[in-house]
Amino acid sequence: MRLISTAFFEQDKFQPKTLVEGAYLALRNDIIKGIYTPSSKLKVDHLKDVYQVSGGTLREALALLVADSLVYAEGQKGFFVSPMSIKDFKEITQLRVILEIQALTQSLKNGNDKWEADVMAAYHRLNLAEKKLALEDIEQRNAQFFSWEERNAEFHASLVSACQSKWLLQFIGILYQQSERYRSLGVHYGTNLKRDLHAEHEALKDAALARNIPLCSEILAEHISITYELFENLPESVFSGKEALAQA
């Protein structure tokens, strides 16, 4: 069973059909939100009570998360949250730029009227979410972040939705999911406050609808790369989870 291939596009619409799928999605979201720190052990006996499933069901969910590289298994020691590092994030960012530009190029060539309408609708929903972020105080803004993240995923997915390569889209989905972990981490350090996300997304939308492939590719590459650049000077302890543990 593979779920992540479509998670990038429909993570907020997906309705789990089995207990394994439900546990997988719940644990996946909690890892991305940083509830479980990088490299921390995921204890089956504890987590089966948290997610109200059997040990066997939870192990199946963890196996799916291993395939997504959000969790790793170590011999007889059990399951652990995958580590994070600035080096890892740099590689994720570089690969996202390469693959998403390829998909964007295909999408802008293939997109029809429905594609344009989907891009406009996704942009409108994202714009509304961004306005909520701007109006709230810091604590409320952080609480709104994950709602914004869903709209952000929808918008990025809409841009490449006319790409006809399922493999390209699947790998983009995996990388996007990994980058979510870092953006979630950035909430606690105010990295998103140092940029004008609305202006970036508006420029991306306008270039896409104009079918200007060179300009849209340039804007997308810069948009993705800025996120990494805002993390470059953070201490490594932020990514290892040690700083979070020290503050607990």
Walk through the language-model features, giving the residues of each.
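C-terminal all-alpha effector/ligand-binding and dimerization domain
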Residues: R2-I4, Q15, R181-A248
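Conserved amphipathic alpha-helical segments that form helical-bundle/coiled-coil interaction surfaces
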Residues: Q102, K114-S184, A199-A210, L215-S225
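Short linear motifs at protein or domain termini
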Residues: M1-K109, E236-A248
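Short, flexible turn/loop "capping" segments at secondary-structure junctions
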Residues: Y72-A73, N152, D196-L197
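Short, flexible helix-adjacent loops and helix caps
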Residues: I32-Y36, L104, L108-N112, K131-E139, ...
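Amphipathic alpha-helical repeat elements characteristic of tetratricopeptide repeat
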Residues: E21, V97, M120, R195-A199
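A ubiquitous short alpha-helical element
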Residues: S85-K90, L108-G111, E139-Q144, S184-T191, ...
